């Protein structure tokens, strides 16, 4: 069971929302952020190093100080304004004609500690520490985390009533994705949402494992520092956008490798044939069409690789994943890449970039071979999280990403 509550969001007035809203901090580098950021962009708060010329280290104290200064300035100028009372909010995203409807709310840090907020990825302490600094210095969750939850018809009905009305925000970003936002204003609806979620068994972290872990750690810190702690303080909660799991779609997360580990192309193909049925598909992009099928781009040609029976364990929720099959039978066994987290010989490409990005990086000589995977399903993610298992690195890619700046949660 999960504990949620509404909050008084700090958010842009309607006339500024398109200028303030920005892509998340971790999907663009400093140079891209500097080029993309307009005067009012939230990137000045999430990527404050862009305000220095020349740019400075994003992890330096002057950058952190600038982030705090900018957050205060945005509020002083009226580009961000706090709502007068706590609300829940509906945030909908449209991509390729498909819309998903999330609830912007606060989740409780205790649920992360207890396991009611379920994760499917390991986190790195250095990344957690960096996110903790941002939460501490701002005393706020500037960006939300992305959760899923089991479908609930009553929640869907409440959301449907609000989205039938005029949205508070409604715009299409430069990437072509639509962003729509409503405020749930009726107290009876707010109370009912809180009650319903108290009976929902779990949240699942879709995207934002490091932000979730950092929020939980900051909450624990502030709890220890407060001799009058009651458990009701705002720092016990952190901001999420939670979507029904049936509405979410995971897209492919692909791999490109810099070398063939000393093999020729023919030797690689021969080694692959031990564990896969290998079929040359030609020069046109070839996309895998089912589980346990991979496409490979090598030497200007696409190949289909279908894992042979008996090469993986259908009863192992991790071993049966295509990312595991590829890692075990190809990346480790043939190409000698044993640790995806630390190897400099491999890179990862989100499916949103298209398979043409894979062939481009091989054709230009940057990489030697590319592998495209069939995407993981939400059911696989939920089953693995429920079993307490952890997916291999770079398994899931969710799109569209949450737009930052539509709502901010202050911890006090």
Language model features with spans:
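Surface-exposed, charge/polar-rich loops and edge strands
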Residues: 1-412
């Amino acid at each position: 069971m999960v504990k949620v509550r509404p909050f008084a969001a700090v958010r842009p007035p309607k006339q500024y929302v398109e200028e303030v809203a920005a892509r998340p901090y971790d999907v663009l580098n400093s140079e891209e952020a500097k080029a993309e950021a307009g005067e009012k962009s939230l990137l000045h708060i999430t990527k404050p190093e862009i305000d220095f010329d020349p740019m400075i280290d994003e992890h330096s104290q002057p950058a952190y100080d600038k982030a705090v200064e900018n957050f205060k300035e945005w509020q002083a100028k009226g580009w961000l304004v706090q709502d007068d009372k706590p609300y829940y909010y509906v945030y909908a995203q449209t991509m390729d004609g498909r819309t998903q409807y999330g609830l912007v709310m606060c989740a409780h840090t205790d649920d992360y500690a207890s396991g009611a907020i379920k994760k499917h990825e390991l986190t790195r302490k250095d990344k957690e520490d960096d996110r903790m600094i941002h939460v501490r210095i701002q005393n706020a969750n500037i960006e939300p985390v992305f959760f899923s939850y089991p479908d609930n018809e009553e929640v869907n009905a409440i959301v449907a009533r609000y989205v039938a009305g005029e949205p508070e925000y409604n715009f299409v970003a430069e990437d072509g994705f639509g962003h729509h936002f409503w405020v749930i204003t009726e107290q009876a609806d707010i109370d009912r949402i809180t009650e319903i979620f108290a009976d929902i068994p779990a949240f699942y972290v879709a995207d934002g494992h490091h932000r979730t872990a950092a929020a939980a750690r900051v909450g624990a810190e502030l709890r220890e520092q407060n001799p009058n702690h009651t458990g009701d303080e705002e720092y016990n909660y952190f901001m999420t956008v939670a979507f029904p799991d049936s509405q979410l779609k995971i897209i492919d997360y692909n791999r490109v490798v810099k070398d063939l580990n000393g093999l020729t192309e023919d030797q690689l193909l021969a080694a692959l044939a031990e564990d896969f049925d290998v079929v040359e598909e030609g020069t046109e992009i070839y996309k895998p069409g089912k589980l346990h099928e991979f496409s490979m781009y090598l030497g200007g040609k696409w190949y289909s690789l279908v894992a042979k029976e008996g090469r993986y364990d259908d009863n192992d929720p991790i071993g049966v994943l295509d990312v595991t099959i590829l890692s075990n039978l190809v990346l480790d066994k043939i190409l000698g890449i044993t640790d995806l987290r630390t190897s400099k010989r491999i890179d990862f490409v989100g499916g949103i970039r298209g398979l043409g990005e894979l062939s481009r990086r091989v054709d230009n000589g940057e990489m030697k071979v590319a592998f495209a995977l069939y995407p993981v399903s939400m059911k696989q993610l939920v089953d693995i999280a429920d079993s307490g298992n952890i997916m291999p690195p770079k398994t899931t890619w969710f799109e569209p990403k949450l737009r930052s700046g539509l709502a901010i949660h202050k911890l006090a």
